[in-house]
Swiss-Prot record:
Enzyme class: isomerase
Matches recorded under PANTHER family: PSEUDOURIDYLATE SYNTHASE TRUB1, TRNA-PSEUDOURIDINE SYNTHASE
Cited HAMAP family: TruB_bact (MF_01080)
Source species: Bacillus anthracis
Gene3D superfamilies per UniProt: Pseudouridine synthase
InterPro entries listed in its UniProt record: PsdUridine_synth_cat_dom_sf, PsdUridine_synth_N, tRNA_psdUridine_synth_TruB, TruB_C
Family: Belongs to the pseudouridine synthase TruB family. Type 1 subfamily.
Active site: 38 (nucleophile)
Protein name stated in the entry: tRNA pseudouridine synthase B
Length: 307
């Protein structure tokens, strides 16, 4: 049993909760997720099973797309709807569509962002949320992130009321805190704000419409069709360029054999396959020997090579 499961993460569960539940359903210990989603967030959560856990790091660096909602009028401790109210300032004027779109535009491109106190970012070996729960404030590291697209989804021309909400879609780099973006939008418009809803619609090439629920996974287990829920390792890595090696080279790859970059591939990672179209390893460019590739992650062992 191996591959990537595209889970439609439900609301109210942490990513670790999802891994724990999937271990029980599949009766498989080797399971890991490819990036944390907050409990209130739903949507695409790729989970690696069996040998696929070795490729998790190559699936976490992808861009992510979210659809969410910002609410102006009050901010919270967690920057989303689950936290306690920190500041209230009713929206006492009409907000125009142009104002919102201009705010989103200023947050598009390469920007700096400070992670929220209620996050898993570590400072001095301790997670920020641990400081927050103890009532301690610490200096947080500023991150550089990339916002590829930030668009308003509401079709209204004006927004008015004591608490204004509007929907958006954002495509961003790994490590972006979308709830912090919601706070930044409010700051641009002059009001406290928080993220009131969020769903991840894409993680790299993995899309929400291709995800399955826990109920569907359990149904496949009961029906004996569990293999159908997996994306193969080969398919999950299909975005990387591919090299094919002969049988003798395949046997040496498990021991860390270097390879010549005969195809002159410039991409940072290269997948290496045997003649049977089985992915053996992921290689990268050797930093000291131009034209050579070195293994970054070997996916097979002695026993598997003999199969």
């Amino acid at each position: 049993m191996e591959g990537v499961v595209l889970l439609h993460k439900p609301k109210g569960m942490t990513s670790h909760d999802c891994v724990f539940k999937l271990r029980k359903i599949l009766r498989e210990k080797r399971i890991g997720h490819t990036g944390t989603l907050d409990p209130d967030v739903t949507g695409v959560l790729p989970i690696c099973v069996g040998r696929a856990t070795k490729i998790a790091q190559f699936l976490t660096s992808e861009t992510k797309t979210y659809e969410g909602e910002v609410t102006l009028g009050f901010s919270t401790t967690t920057e989303d709807a689950s936290g306690e109210v920190v500041e209230t300032k009713y929206v006492d004027r009409v907000i125009t569509r142009k104002e919102v779109e201009e705010a989103l535009a200023t947050l598009t491109g390469t920007i700096e962002q400070m992670p929220p106190m209620f996050s898993a970012v570590k400072v001095n070996g301790k997670k920020l949320y641990e400081y927050a729960r103890a009532g301690q404030e610490v200096e947080r590291p500023v991150r550089t992130i990339t916002i590829h697209e930030f668009v308003l989804l509401d079709d209204r021309e004006v927004f008015e009321g004591e608490n204004i909400s509007f929907r958006f879609r954002v495509t961003c780099s790994k490590g972006t805190y979308v709830r912090t973006l919601a706070v930044m939008i409010g700051e641009k418009l002059g009001f406290p704000s928080h993220m009131s809803h969020l769903v991840r619609t894409a993680s790299g090439e993995f899309l929400l419409e291709d995800c399955i629920s826990f109920e569907e996974i359990e149904e496949n287990v009961q029906n004996g069709t569990v293999e159908s829920i997996f994306i193969s390792i080969d398919e999950a890595l299909s975005k990387f360029p591919k090299m094919v090696v002969d049988e003798k080279q395949a046997e040496k790859i498990k021991n860390g054999m270097f390879l010549k970059n005969e195809l002159q591939i410039t991409a940072p990672f290269i997948t290496v396959f045997d003649k049977n179209d089985r992915c053996l390893a992921i290689y990268e460019h050797h930093p000291k020997h131009p034209g050579m590739l070195k293994p970054m992650k070997v996916l097979v062992n002695n026993q598997e090579l003999k199969l």
